[in-house]
Amino acid sequence: MLPARLPFRLLSLFLRGSAPTAARHGLREPLLERRCAAASSFQHSSSLGRELPYDPVDTEGFGEGGDMQERFLFPEYILDPEPQPTREKQLQELQQQQEEEERQRQQRREERRQQNLRARSREHPVVGHPDPALPPSGVNCSGCGAELHCQDAGVPGYLPREKFLRTAEADGGLARTVCQRCWLLSHHRRALRLQVSREQYLELVSAALRRPGPSLVLYMVDLLDLPDALLPDLPALVGPKQLIVLGNKVDLLPQDAPGYRQRLRERLWEDCARAGLLLAPGHQGPQRPVKDEPQDGENPNPPNWSRTVVRDVRLISAKTGYGVEELISALQRSWRYRGDVYLVGATNAGKSTLFNTLLESDYCTAKGSEAIDRATISPWPGTTLNLLKFPICNPTPYRMFKRHQRLKKDSTQAEEDLSEQEQNQLNVLKKHGYVVGRVGRTFLYSEEQKDNIPFEFDADSLAFDMENDPVMGTHKSTKQVELTAQDVKDAHWFYDTPGITKENCILNLLTEKEVNIVLPTQSIVPRTFVLKPGMVLFLGAIGRIDFLQGNQSAWFTVVASNILPVHITSLDRADALYQKHAGHTLLQIPMGGKERMAGFPPLVAEDIMLKEGLGASEAVADIKFSSAGWVSVTPNFKDRLHLRGYTPEGTVLTVRPPLLPYIVNIKGQRIKKSVAYKTKKPPSLMYNVRKKKGKINV
């Protein structure tokens, strides 16, 4: 075994070198110092070296190096470079990464699905159970007027047992509570079918109208449904009452020519006369036609006081407010405060919308406007199931004077002078209707003012108290207001009656989703097509017109909901197209595929012969598909057309004189290589607002 000093001696000999080498490179001491310094620095930088204990060695020949240490050094260990991953390994890692990302996506997708399921369960909370043992509450639903109960889910006014008991035990009880059906209609546009027959509707309305005392009837008519909107049994239902006919939804009809609203009003007068209503003397409509010979026992000349008399006919839009302020002024001037007022009409005529509009107007007392909830509004027929009411404001001279001042001030305001909120509201209404009006309030009930009054005034005494005038404003009090016995003492009421269901109506065959598509909610944009004999027009899968014979082409203008599809095909392909696409996307209504069409009534044909054409700019007839809309037909001059119309079995196909005879002119250029024309929407008009140039719309 070698001695421990041997490595050091070998190192010393190596460093000492030979004399010639030392002579060539200079003195040995500097070289030794440099190498020792390098060794020392290398020792400190290395983590693998270790310092040896000092041992004196022979330093002869090193000069003054007796205190020098010798160190044993290891070079720093450097790891070998890792080999580069192979292509197979890279592909494997990439595949694992993709699988992990896909797993995370699947997890997020499943979480979103669970959230949607929970959200849908909240959107359709038809939960709870009925309890036939609990008696009815005696409190009416504030949305539809039905008595609240928890006995049967198919009876109007139903609340689940849990909700019924929880609400009854809370503060305030069931007051101002809506039933389950109204809640679903208001929040989710979802309707529950109820077991209410047409006879029950008629019995309820007839009992209300035959209450003792003077009363006025406002009969609301859907202009889109003329002449079917006028009920044939209306005189027997109303009895010897004074009647004002309101043509609603005028905002949905475009202006086909100047003076179209006056023509619509005259048309409504004519339809009232055809329906057997007695027109009041001095009216501006046509004279009542002569009836057939009276039957045995019938008075050939019944007195006017025993008949239903039409006092006036007006066009309004309960949604956009057009004509509502004029209606209020007419009621306050003519009827004043002589008795109750009843709003009557068929289902989906817009009665509840007008009820809510009048509730926020001068026709309702200021306190009643804040104390009574709004009626439920929905396109689903039969929303109102019982009587809703609000107290009518007594039109005293002072109130009439203040109202006239407000209306005069409003008419001088330009649209740019209105508040931003009111401008936004009017802009929204312009998108929904062709004519828009403003409905405001002159007086606002103030709860703070009431607290300062030592005792309660009734409506009349408060109107004549000049020191305690009702506060002007447009915002409702945030506090809950309740009508007291003094408020309703000797009051006259405005009643919203349930809608009378129409027989042979196509809406009775449709689901709630289909009703929302068929019934128009925005201004109707007419769609015009030029057809040749042998062509067929489909209005969804609920209406069809075959062009069988004619000397020339004719124009067919569809006046229906803008989202109800229209499809044109040839006569030899029409049956196959209906069999293939009825219930699917192309025709859209009805929807639900073969299962839906299996229970849907088949289309029934009816031949139609039209009179000679009046030219390319004037229609000769409207072919109306129940409440789904109509097609206005415009043949060429002196051309006679033979058509065939189809509607579902159990519904009515009506051929009437054109309601808008010049509507064919509301079209753009013809689309190249197509039978369709580009649509054109007329502008909307604002009323009771001054234009920019200082001109007032009246």
From Swiss-Prot:
Output one GO MF annotation. RNA binding
SUPFAM superfamilies (UniProt xref): P-loop containing nucleoside triphosphate hydrolases
* Intrachain disulfide bonds: none
Domain CP-type G, by residue range, is: 202-503
What subcellular compartments does it reside in? Answer: Mitochondrion inner membrane
Domain of life of the native organism: Eukaryota
| A GO cellular component annotation in the UniProt record | mitochondrial inner membrane
Q: Which GO terms describe its biological process?
A: apoptotic process; mitochondrial ribosome assembly; mitochondrion organization
> What does the annotation say about its assembly with partners?
Homodimer or multimer. Interacts with mitochondrial complex I, DAP3, MRPL12 and MRPS27.
* Family statement drawn from the similarity comment of this UniProt entry: Belongs to the TRAFAC class YlqF/YawG GTPase family. NOA1 subfamily.
Q: What is this protein called?
A: Nitric oxide-associated protein 1
According to its UniProt entry, this protein's organism is Homo sapiens
